[in-house]
UniProtKB/Swiss-Prot annotation:
Family in the record: Belongs to the TMEM120 family.
A Pfam family hit: TMEM120A-B
Membrane topology (UniProt): Multi-pass membrane protein
Name by which UniProt lists this protein: Transmembrane protein 120 homolog
Organism: Drosophila melanogaster (Fruit fly)
Length: 387
């Protein structure tokens, strides 16, 4: 290849680079527009909540006996308020959220918001797969520790627990930022478990550890099995939530979702309660070990307290969450309806953008078509209503 051919190739590359610069300028403009629309949405959500609080406060005067006509209107307003809260929550899922203090300490001031619904589902799915893989590894290592009494194998397993729970706390904090409704106790549970694993890691080899060792390994084998059952339950929930919004002919209704959720939960609860009982048994065993044999290291009493704390927290939270879910079925129904509509709307917008690309390919350049599609996607709910 001679120098003239290379020169011509460079000139062609320059033309392509000019197109790239033009595309990048449009991209930057759209990013600025996106930020502007996000601020508008934040302000409108704040305004909606302020007005709703005023209406809710005014409704309190109708708590006493009211005429039948007014009672029906009051009930309708209460239902519409619940529905609007669910709608606002769903809108917030498409907007960036601030990281919590824990993430700011661990990762710094980094934006971890996932704005695309499918990406959120994918991240949640990846989180569940991560737990499954690590639980299988933990199950295998705990099983080997039951067969072989090697200190190096014990330390490797306990170090795995420390790393696993540390990673879970970070991933769950990211999920929380992105709208996950995980209860505060379950996050605290993993922080406490991290501390417990750290105490186990520095627990010196001795008579007290050898007495408790086998019981602890059996406990981990059982917990790994329960985690596998939980993985199946969570995967089923994710699939059905996805089906609510992504299927044109939905293969599951909201009533069907609730029915499956309660069946799965009723199957899982006995295994969970047995696990909680095992935690209480561990706490009692360690409490006795703290006094006999004598000269027990401080790790014994600390681990006894941590297992007791985990038992009380898990039992109380589970017994509180199940009745709460029953009481809030109406609110949950509105949330699922809003989620389903939002996911279907996003899919329709995506399909419309694809149809536009095909139909106007001869009239618009690829860059212009992309600009149109992104501009449509960044419209606020108010703008979409006006159009």
């Amino acid at each position: 290849m001679n120098i003239d051919s290379l020169k011509n190739e460079w000139e062609e590359l320059n033309k392509e680079f000019a197109e790239l610069e033009s595309c990048n300028r449009r991209y930057i403009e759209l990013l600025e527009q996106l930020h502007s629309h996000q601020q508008i949405c934040f302000n409108e959500i704040k305004h909606q909540r302020y007005r709703m609080n005023q209406i809710t406060t005014s409704l309190r005067q109708f708590k006493g006996p009211v005429p039948a006509e007014d009672k029906e209107k009051v009930d309708d307003l209460h239902k519409m308020t619940l529905k609007r809260k669910a709608q606002l929550h769903e809108i917030e899922q498409s907007l960036p959220a601030k990281s919590g203090r824990y993430l700011q300490i661990i990762l710094g001031d980094v934006n971890v918001s996932i704005l695309n619904r499918n990406d959120k589902v994918r991240y949640k799915d990846d989180y569940e797969k991560f737990k499954l893989i690590l639980n299988v590894i933990g199950l295998i290592m705990a099983f080997f520790n039951l067969i072989f009494n090697y200190r190096a194998l014990e330390l490797a397993f306990i170090f795995l627990l420390v790393w696993y729970y540390c990673t879970l706390t970070i991933r769950e904090s990211i999920l929380k930022v992105n709208g996950s409704r995980i209860k505060g106790w379950w996050r605290a549970h993993h922080f406490i478990s991290t501390v417990a694993a750290g105490v186990l890691l520095v627990w010196p080899q001795g008579e007290h550890w050898q007495i408790f060792r086998m019981q602890f390994m059996y406990f981990n084998v059982y917990i790994s099995i329960v985690q596998y059952l939980q993985f199946g339950y969570q995967k089923g929930l994710l699939y059905r939530l996805k089906a609510l919004g992504e299927r044109h002919n939905m293969d599951i209704t909201i009533e069907g979702f609730h029915s499956w959720m309660w069946r799965g939960l009723s199957f899982l609860l006995p295994f969970l309660f047995i696990g909680y009982g095992y935690q209480a048994y561990n706490a009692w065993t360690l409490y006795k070990l703290a006094y006999s044999p004598p000269d027990a290291p401080w790790h014994v009493s600390v681990m006894s307290g941590l297992f007791l704390l985990l038992f009380v927290g898990n039992m109380a939270t589970t017994l509180w969450v199940v009745p709460e879910k029953i009481r809030e079925r109406a609110k949950e129904r509105y949330r699922l309806q809003s989620m389903g509509k939002s996911m279907k709307l996003r899919k329709e917008m995506k399909n419309s953008a694809s149809d536009l690309d095909l139909s106007s390919g001869s009239k618009l350049s690829p860059t212009a078509t992309t600009t149109t599609s992104i501009a449509t996607a960044t419209q606020t709910p108010a703008e979409k209503k006006e159009t």
